[in-house]
From Swiss-Prot:
<dbReference type="InterPro" id="IPR024074">
    <property type="entry name" value="AS_cat/multimer_dom_body"/>
</dbReference>
<feature type="binding site">
    <location>
        <position position="117"/>
    </location>
    <ligand>
        <name>L-aspartate</name>
    </ligand>
</feature>
<feature type="binding site">
    <location>
        <position position="85"/>
    </location>
    <ligand>
        <name>L-citrulline</name>
    </ligand>
</feature>
<keyword id="KW-0436">Ligase</keyword>
<dbReference type="InterPro" id="IPR018223">
    <property type="entry name" value="Arginosuc_synth_CS"/>
</dbReference>
<keyword id="KW-0963">Cytoplasm</keyword>
<feature type="binding site">
    <location>
        <position position="172"/>
    </location>
    <ligand>
        <name>L-citrulline</name>
    </ligand>
</feature>
<feature type="binding site">
    <location>
        <begin position="7"/>
        <end position="15"/>
    </location>
    <ligand>
        <name>ATP</name>
    </ligand>
</feature>
<dbReference type="InterPro" id="IPR023434">
    <property type="entry name" value="Arginosuc_synth_type_1_subfam"/>
</dbReference>
<dbReference type="GO" id="GO:0005737">
    <property type="term" value="C:cytoplasm"/>
</dbReference>
<dbReference type="GO" id="GO:0005524">
    <property type="term" value="F:ATP binding"/>
</dbReference>
<comment type="similarity">
    <text>Belongs to the argininosuccinate synthase family. Type 1 subfamily.</text>
</comment>
<feature type="binding site">
    <location>
        <position position="269"/>
    </location>
    <ligand>
        <name>L-citrulline</name>
    </ligand>
</feature>
<protein>
    <recommendedName>
        <fullName>Argininosuccinate synthase</fullName>
        <ecNumber>6.3.4.5</ecNumber>
    </recommendedName>
</protein>
<dbReference type="InterPro" id="IPR048268">
    <property type="entry name" value="Arginosuc_syn_C"/>
</dbReference>
<dbReference type="GO" id="GO:0000053">
    <property type="term" value="P:argininosuccinate metabolic process"/>
</dbReference>
<feature type="binding site">
    <location>
        <position position="257"/>
    </location>
    <ligand>
        <name>L-citrulline</name>
    </ligand>
</feature>
Length: 396
């Protein structure tokens, strides 16, 4: 084995992995860092990669691709795993895997590697991308192989002269444009309230402004295109909402999560923009979709989120679901007015040129009402199956 391409975050695990891979396989190690919006010092990451022993380092700016190829379909699918988590990490991993494979092909590498552990979801997500896109390339998972604990990793890094000052952080953080995940420390106790020091994107709700913020989000075909009437690129909308909603304390998630590998974990997230966009659009869908469309879309949305969380981005059913959900979103056009106030978001208005709601028919103040004869006929036909089966079974 002569060349290994490693998905490199710059943290302890992947930095140790560089030196370990060189030592274990006698191979040249090429590191790849993919910029998906994480607030990192990429120059420092590059320097650390070389100090760890990398022969070459790639920094790939994939923010626009992340937004257009991954976040956009997630918005259309109202993607919230277990109804709360907007899949920031799960969406980024297939893209990172794809970029690692591109570099591996360019460099003529024999193998690719990742820094995921055997307890986490990311091992599945990375390897799904590797296997789908380059089944001929060998996959190496150093952390699953070396058997070192955290303390031993530090000692190994010190021995190899790898600078890991950032690893004194209390929590394990994964961040991109769509969400920020926080793990470790006292958060592993489900009874322990997350301390404020764990959060960066959102202010404590009780310290948010005393005055609410009203915001109008315009959607076209299920995708936000404007804020307060000003058209913006999706990446700009996400950035703006992360700041605005976060300033009002909105966007925190704290829940018990069912991992791909069968373990439960306590997960804490910040996702102000994601939750603002998705919860606004879900309300708009109620205005423009009929009852059957709405019910089917809710089912498909949930399945899409489960699929992506479980590492199956490269499954053909995901492509089919994208097509179905896009078709169902053709009429999801209009404006949603939301009120942000001290950690909460309320939809307070919605309008659409495609609205199915008709005040002239629905209002109790309108002159049109179904006749008694029409109502009786509908009720009898609607209830027949239920009434007959209930009486036959339980009123003998």
């Amino acid at each position: 084995m002569s060349k290994i391409v490693l998905a490199y975050s710059g943290g302890l695990d992947t930095s140790v992995a560089v030196a370990w891979l060189k030592e274990k396989f006698g191979a040249e190690v090429i590191t790849v860092t993919v910029d998906v919006g994480q607030k990192e010092d990429f120059k420092e990451i590059e320097e650390r990669a070389y100090k760890a022993g990398a022969s070459k380092h790639y920094l790939i700016d994939a923010k626009e691709e992340f937004v257009n190829k991954y976040i956009k379909p997630a918005i259309i699918a109202n993607a919230l795993y277990e109804e709360v988590y907007p899949l920031g990490t799960a969406l980024a991993r297939p893209l990172i895997g794809e970029k690692v494979i591109e570099v591996a092909r360019k460099e003529g590498a024999d193998a690719v590697a990742h820094g995921a552990t055997s307890k986490g979801n990311d091992q599945v997500r990375f390897e799904a991308a590797f296997k789908a896109l380059a089944p001929e390339i060998k996959i190496i998972a150093p952390i699953r192989m070396w058997g070192m604990n955290r303390k031993e990793e530090y000692e190994f890094a010190k021995k190899k002269g790898i600078p890991i000052s950032a690893e004194s952080k209390k929590y394990s953080i994964d961040e991109n444009l769509w969400s920020r995940s926080i793990e470790g420390g006292e958060l592993e106790d489900p009874w322990q309230e997350p301390p404020e020091e764990a959060f960066e994107w959102t202010v404590p709700p009780e310290k948010a402004p005393e005055e609410p913020a009203y915001l109008t989000i315009t959607f076209e075909k299920g995708v936000p295109v404007a804020l307060n009437g000003k058209r913006m690129e999706l990446i700009e909308i996400i950035d703006t909402l992360n700041k605005l909603a976060g300033q009002h304390g909105y966007g925190r998630v704290d829940h018990m999560e069912n991992r791909v590998v069968g373990l439960k974990s306590r997960e804490v997230y910040e996702a102000p923009a994601a939750l603002t966009i998705i919860n606004s659009k879900k309300d708009l869908e109620k205005l423009v979709l009929n009852k059957r469309e709405y019910r089917i879309k809710r089912m498909l949305d949930s399945y899409w989120a489960d699929l992506v969380y479980d590492g199956l981005w490269f499954d053909p059913i995901r492509v089919a679901l994208d097509n179905m959900l896009s078709e169902l979103s053709e009429n999801v056009n209009g404006d949603v007015k939301v009120k942000l106030y001290k950690g909460s978001l309320r939809v307070v208005g919605r309008r659409s040129p495609n609205a199915i709601y008709d005040k002239a028919i629905s209002s109790y103040e309108s002159e049109w009402f179904p006749s008694d004869e029409m109502a009786r006929g509908f009720i009898d036909a609607w209830l027949m199956d239920s009434v007959v089966s209930f009486r036959k079974r339980y009123l003998k």
